[in-house]
Amino acid sequence: MKNNIQKGFYLVLSVAVVLLLISFIPKFKIGNKEFKRVDLLSDLKVSDGGDIDNPDGTDSTFVDDGGGTVVTDSASVVEPEKELVTVQLGQLTPNGTIRIEDYGPMERNGLNGFVWSLKQIGLKKNVRIAYYGDSFIEGDILTGSLRDLLRERFGGKGVGYVDITSQVSGFRVTVKHKYGNWNSFAATERSGFDASKQGIAARYFTNAGNAFVELKGSKNGVALDRADKSTIYFVSRSNAVIASSINGEPQEKHQIEGSESLQHITVEGDIESIRWSVLSAPNAIFYGVTMDGTEGVVLDNLSMRSSSGYHLKGIPEQRLQEFNKARHYDLIVLEYGLNVAGKNQKNYSTYKKNMIATIEHLKSAFPNTSFMLVSVSDRDYRASDGQMHTMPGVKALVEAQREIAQECGIAFWDLYTAMGGDGSMAAMAKKGMANKDYTHINSKGGKKIAELFYDAIMYEVER
């Protein structure tokens, strides 16, 4: 009897050892059949909860496995399965550019959705990007060059979304913008501003009598001289009449029924110029007009001078949700910090709290959109050694912004390091790429940074 018990014990032990060894065999294929790894201890293992709080600063991203999911032009996209890949901080692309850190690989708001959309652009009508920022990008500096690079690879037409009126229309070269007879309101200009009325760019405009806005294509960029369609976005609570004129042709009148929700009119054609005129629109609120292609990349510059980025939290979520349906974005980029960084400031806890709330507000309204936080750029001062160095507060802010991206589960790109780190803005100024305030870049500098950003994006697309 004792001998039988021993035999039984050794048999069970042998089977257990064999099964345990099987769990170490990696997945393999025989013909077209794939055999996956079996982990017999998986139910006993405790998950570490992801990489967001990993003390060594690593993050993770996914690469698609070549699945054949068909992507349509809608806010809900079914993505293929992804494999987890760890990215170390400071890792470079083959061209030497700082890579994008993705802290949301297992969330819908990580970079994967945008990367997948670019890969499937032939099956998708448009891939849209909203690029929010402060004066660092106003006038389409940086964003204009990034749009050009993406257009050369993925196609597209037109300048995208333009506010009804603009502070930068006099020096923006990517579109010719005329307007008249409007009352303008912005989140950073408190006088008379009603936060409940603002739109996607934290602005709104009302008719002061026979108002009009006109966009004309530009040759200062890739495929900016014409578009396939133009849209005007507004809310008119009572019936209204709005007219459109393509390329100076006779007006077409559009009869609008009153509604509390976001409305839009779209006209199509070979559009070199578009003029929208308000014939009758009592109490209507207007937001912006577009020149877009029917295919390829659309990049909207949504800059707000003197902003920290907090103002975006004030945009009503319902209005954002309506824009998500009418003009869904595959990627929303947030680049702020010039108006936050203090020379010697080290504690950015209040900023972090406010910015996290802002990003979560946007994520709630755009649940199927990828988000990326771009760090503050270098900002220099003359130190005690007589040389130009980065303000200490900038370095602390970059780390705070990385922590924001980690907590929000979105992508992060370290622009400060990518452009060269300490003293890099002064170095760019010496090369004629930045202003002597050692804070703002010019169009030449914008082109350089756009090339770096494009390289970082394309590495994620191609790997």
Regions found by a protein language model. Name each.
Residues G67, V71-V175, N442-S443:
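Long, contiguous interaction/targeting segments characteristic
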Residues M1-Q6:
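Short, Lys/Arg-rich N-terminal segment immediately upstream of the first membrane anchor
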Residues F9-K27:
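Hydrophobic membrane-insertion alpha-helices, especially the h-region
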Residues K125-G133, E138, L142, G296-G386, ...:
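Conserved, compact domain cores that house catalytic/ligand-binding motifs in diverse enzymes
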Residues I98-I121, A201-S218, P250-Q255:
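Short N-terminal or domain-adjacent regulatory/targeting segments
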Residues K29-V87:
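Juxtamembrane proline-rich low-complexity "stalk" or linker regions positioned immediately after a signal peptide
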Residues E138-S245, Q255-K353, H440:
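Conserved SGNH/GDSL esterase-like catalytic core that processes O-acyl groups on lipids
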